[in-house]
Amino acid sequence: MRIQRSLGIVLYNKNYREDDKLVKIFTEAAGKRMFFVKHIGRSKLAPVVQPLTAADFLLKINDSSLSYIEDYNQVEAYRHINEDFFRLSYASYVLALADAAIPDNEPDPQLFAFLKKTLDLIEEGLDYDILTNIFEIQILDRFGVRMNFHDCVFCHSTNLPFDFSHKYSGVLCPQHYHEDEGRYGLDPNVIYLINRFQTINIDELKTISVNADMKKKLRLFIDALYEDYVGIRLKSKVFIDDLAKWGDIMKNKQGL
C-alpha cells in the first residue's frame, strides 16, 4: 500500500456487512477506486462517503484490493444540487457516466477536472440539461467514439445546413445529402450546437440560453448517438428520462 493525497469525488456507496461501507471515489491522482470504511456509524468519515461529495482525501491506496481513507479536509457537499431533485438527478447521471467511461484504477485527471467543473456549474445554477449534453458529447471519446460534427465527411465543407448520417458516422453538407437517403433529417441547429458542445471549453462557460424545443431535439439526437455508438443504458439515465414524463407536475408542486 502507499499513502497518497488526492482530490476526490464520491461516486456511490453501498452497505457491506452490518456496519461497514464500500465507497467508490473518483480520485484525481489514482483514478476510480473502491474504499473500505469500517463501522461507518461511528466513523469520522461518515460526512464524506455520500455521493456527490468532493474533498481533499488522504488515502491508503492498494493496487490489488480495497483501499482505505485515512483522513480528509476541504469538503464540498454540493448543497444546492442535493436540495434540488432535478439537479440531483442530472448530476447523478453525470457521475454514473463518468464511472462507465473509463476503467477503474487508471488516473484520468482531465476527466476528473471536467466532471468537477460540470458539477460546480450545476451547483451554481447553470442549465443542467445543457451541461449534461456537453458532458455527454465531450466524453464520447472515452467510449472510443470519435465524431466530427464540424465539416462534411465527403468534401469537408463547413457550410451549413448539415445533416447527420449514421451510414457515414458524420455530417453531410447539402451537396452530399443524396449520399444517404436515410439521413436523420435533423434541424441544422442541432448539429450546430453539438459541434459547439464538442469544442467548448467548459472552464470559460458563463451563461447558457437554449429554448425548450431545441433541448428536446438535442436530447433525442444524443440519445440516438448513445444507443447506436456507445450501447449503454444507465439506470440514472432511465430515471431522468422518466422525469420528462412527470417532471412538470413536480415542478408545479415545488412552485418552480
UniProtKB/Swiss-Prot annotation:
Q: Does the keyword Nucleus apply?
A: no
Identify the domain of life.
Bacteria
Q: Which residues cross the membrane?
A: none
Q: Which UniProt keywords apply?
A: DNA damage, DNA recombination, DNA repair
One GO biological process term is: double-strand break repair
Has UniProt tagged this entry with the keyword Ligase?
A: no
Pfam families hit by this protein = RecO_C, RecO_N
Q: Which InterPro entries match?
A: ARFGAP/RecO, DNA_rep/recomb_RecO_N, NA-bd_OB-fold, RecO, RecO_C
GO cellular component terms, alphabetically, are: bacterial nucleoid
The UniProt similarity line reads: Belongs to the RecO family.
What function is annotated for this protein? Answer: Involved in DNA repair and RecF pathway recombination.
**Record NCBIfam families:** reco
Q: What is this protein called?
A: DNA repair protein RecO
What species is given as this protein's source? Streptococcus equi subsp. zooepidemicus (strain MGCS10565)
Lineage from the top down? Bacteria, Bacillati, Bacillota, Bacilli, Lactobacillales
